[in-house]
C-alpha cells in the first residue's frame, strides 16, 4: 500500500538560471535547454531496453533533471523517482577530508540546482511524476510495489550497488540496468574500483562487466533475456553503454 504523504511537494522554480541541467531537455514553452552532461535524445528506447512502459508503475533511481522520468511518462508510465536528500548529497569516495572538501561544497550547490532543474522541467511538462527524497539504500515499503525499476547510469556512483539492486528487486518485477560498457572486463562477473589516489574520482566508484549484474540478478531469481549495447553522447563525445533487463519469474 502506497503512502502518498512520503512524496515531495513540487517546488516552484521560475528561473532557469537557478538550474543545473544534467540532460539536454526539450521543454514545452522553453525549447531546447542544453545539458551539461548527457544528451540522450533520439536513443531513449535503447537506453531503456526497448521496454513497453504503457500502464506500468515505475521506480526510478536517481532522476537528475528528469529526462528519463518524463520520457517514460510520455510512454504511459506512472513514475516515482528516488533522489538523495540534502543531508546525503552524494555517495562520496572517501578521499582525505582536506582534499574532499574541494568537491563537497560545490557539489551541494550543484545538487540543489539539479533538483531545481527537475522541478522546472516537471512544471513545463505538467508532469504527474512523484519524487521521494531519502536514503536509496533503505527504501521504505510505503513507496509500494512496482512493475519496473530503472537504474540508469547510477550504480557506478554508489558504494554498494548490489544493495540498491536488492532493494529494487524486492519492489519490482522487472529491473532495467544501464551503465558504461567496459569491454576489457567482459567474460567474468566482476567490478573494478575506479578511483585512484591520482585521478580524484570522488563521484564514481565502479566499472562493471555485464556478467556482474546478470549473475547477481540470477541469484535473486531474475532472468536476463538480452543485453543491448548503444551509443550515447556525454559532453559532446560518443560513449558505448549497455542496458540489460531482468524479469522475475
Positions of predicted regions on the chain:
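Conserved alpha-helix/loop element of class I SAM-dependent methyltransferases that forms part
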Residues: 33-56
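S-adenosyl-L-methionine-dependent methyltransferase catalytic module, highlighting the catalytic core
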Residues: 137-141, 150-151, 159-249
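N-terminal, positively charged/glycine-rich alpha-helical extensions of SAM-dependent methyltransferases
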Residues: 1-28
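Conserved class I S-adenosyl-L-methionine
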Residues: 56-64
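Short amphipathic alpha-helix with an adjacent loop that forms part of the alpha/beta core around
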Residues: 49, 138-145
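Conserved beta-strand positions in the Rossmann-like core of class I SAM-dependent methyltransferases
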Residues: 59, 80, 176
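Alpha-helix C-terminal capping/helix-to-coil transition sites in glycosyltransferase folds
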Residues: 54, 145-146, 171
Amino acid at each position: 500500500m502506497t503512502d502518498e504523504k512520503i512524496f515531495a511537494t513540487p517546488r516552484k522554480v521560475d528561473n532557469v538560471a537557478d538550474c543545473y541541467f544534467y540532460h539536454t531537455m526539450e521543454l514545452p514553452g522553453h525549447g531546447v535547454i542544453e545539458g551539461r552532461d548527457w544528451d540522450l535524445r533520439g536513443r531513449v528506447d535503447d537506453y531503456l531496453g526497448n521496454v513497453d512502459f504503457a500502464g506500468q508503475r515505475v521506480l526510478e533511481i536517481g532522476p537528475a533533471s528528469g529526462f528519463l522520468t518524463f520520457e517514460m511518462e510520455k510512454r504511459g508510465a506512472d513514475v516515482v523517482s528516488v533522489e538523495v536528500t540534502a543531508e546525503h548529497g552524494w555517495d562520496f569516495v572517501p578521499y582525505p577530508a582536506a582534499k574532499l572538501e574541494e568537491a563537497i561544497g560545490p557539489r551541494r550547490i550543484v545538487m540543489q540546482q539539479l533538483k531545481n532543474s527537475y522541478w522546472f522541467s516537471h512544471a513545463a511538462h505538467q508532469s504527474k511524476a512523484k519524487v521521494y527524497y531519502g536514503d536509496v539504500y533503505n527504501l521504505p515499503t510505503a513507496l509500494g510495489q512496482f512493475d519496473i525499476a530503472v537504474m540508469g547510469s547510477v550504480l557506478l556512483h554508489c558504494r554498494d550497488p548490489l544493495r540498491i539492486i536488492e532493494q529494487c528487486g524486492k519492489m519490482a518485477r522487472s529491473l532495467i540496468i544501464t551503465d558504461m560498457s567496459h569491454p576489457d572486463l567482459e567474460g567474468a562477473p566482476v567490478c573494478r574500483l575506479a578511483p585512484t589516489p591520482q585521478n580524484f574520482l570522488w563521484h564514481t566508484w565502479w566499472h562493471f562487466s555485464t556478467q556482474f549484474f546478470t549473475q547477481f540478478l540470477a541469484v535473486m531469481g531474475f532472468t536476463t533475456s538480452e543485453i543491448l549495447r548503444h551509443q550515447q553522447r556525454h559532453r559532446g563525445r560518443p560513449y558505448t553503454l549497455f542496458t540489460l533487463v531482468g524479469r522475475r519469474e
